[in-house]
């Protein structure tokens, strides 16, 4: 069962009840708390587009606690982050693994953060396919192409050479928040909100 807390707010018109995510959205906060799939991506994209329409100059705060997920769904979020005029600040809480680490790195320069005990994981894309040999070959070429462009994106956002990214993503590469800062995935480790 998935419980969502309700927040009650006093206004000049009386009480108003919001689910917690709607209340956070009023403060331009988007929360990714779980695997990235098409449904999650669509919700996050819709929230980003809404907040940009409300005020394209104001920051969007994107909190991430995710094990990663479907690359195409993650890329839809990534493209939207780059597309909207509002700067997207990223904040890692808990973990940003796989596709989620790329989203963390894709935040606006100078506005990519992590809490001190979060962990960050980068690696190459995973995939599995079965079927005819020709179809397997097609999918193998696609996952190799995907690995290349994901490495290029990570290189662009971290400032690391593509060769280092390719080496480091060959296997699971875990980082602490401080290590992620040194790597260029984030800009700052926060203990307390400023």
From Swiss-Prot:
| GO MF annotation list | ATP-dependent peptidase activity; ATPase binding; serine-type endopeptidase activity
Q: What is its main location?
A: cytoplasm
Task: Tell me one GO biological process term.
Answer: protein quality control for misfolded or incompletely synthesized proteins
Class of this enzyme: hydrolase
Q: Which domain of life, per UniProt?
A: Bacteria
- EC number(s) reported in the record: 3.4.21.92
Indicate whether Hydrolase appears among the record's keywords: yes
- Listed Gene3D superfamilies: 2-enoyl-CoA Hydratase, Chain A, domain 1
Query: What reactions does this protein catalyze?
Result: Hydrolysis of proteins to small peptides in the presence of ATP and magnesium. alpha-casein is the usual test substrate. In the absence of ATP, only oligopeptides shorter than five residues are hydrolyzed (such as succinyl-Leu-Tyr-|-NHMec, and Leu-Tyr-Leu-|-Tyr-Trp, in which cleavage of the -Tyr-|-Leu- and -Tyr-|-Trp bonds also occurs)
Q: Where in the cell is it found?
A: Cytoplasm
Q: Which UniProt keywords apply?
A: Cytoplasm, Hydrolase, Protease, Serine protease
Which sites are catalytic? Answer: 98, 123
Q: Which PANTHER family match?
A: ATP-DEPENDENT CLP PROTEASE PROTEOLYTIC SUBUNIT, ATP-DEPENDENT CLP PROTEASE PROTEOLYTIC SUBUNIT, MITOCHONDRIAL
Role according to the record? Cleaves peptides in various proteins in a process that requires ATP hydrolysis. Has a chymotrypsin-like activity. Plays a major role in the degradation of misfolded proteins.
Name of the protein described by the UniProt record: ATP-dependent Clp protease proteolytic subunit
Query: Which organism is this protein's natural source?
Result: Pelotomaculum thermopropionicum (strain DSM 13744 / JCM 10971 / SI)
Which lineage ranks, top first, belong to the organism behind this chain? Bacteria, Bacillati, Bacillota, Clostridia, Eubacteriales
């Amino acid at each position: 069962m998935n419980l969502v807390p309700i927040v009650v707010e006093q206004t000049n018109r009386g009480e108003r009840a919001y689910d917690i995510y709607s209340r956070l959205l009023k403060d331009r906060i988007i929360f990714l708390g779980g695997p990235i799939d098409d449904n999650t991506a669509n919700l996050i994209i819709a929230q980003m587009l809404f907040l940009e329409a409300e005020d394209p100059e104001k920051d969007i705060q994107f909190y991430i606690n995710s094990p990663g997920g479907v690359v195409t769904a993650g890329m839809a979020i990534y493209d939207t982050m780059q597309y909207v005029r509002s700067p997207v600040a990223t904040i890692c809480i808990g973990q940003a693994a796989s596709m989620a680490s790329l989203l963390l790195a894709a935040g606006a320069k100078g506005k990519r953060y992590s809490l001190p005990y979060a962990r960050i994981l980068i690696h190459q894309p995973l995939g599995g396919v079965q079927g005819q040999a020709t179809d397997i070959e097609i999918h193998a070429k696609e996952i190799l192409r995907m690995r290349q462009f994901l490495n290029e994106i990570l290189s662009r956002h971290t400032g690391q050479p593509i060769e280092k990214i390719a080496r480091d993503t060959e296997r699971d590469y875990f980082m602490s928040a401080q290590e992620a800062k040194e790597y260029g995935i984030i800009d700052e480790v926060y203990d307390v909100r400023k």
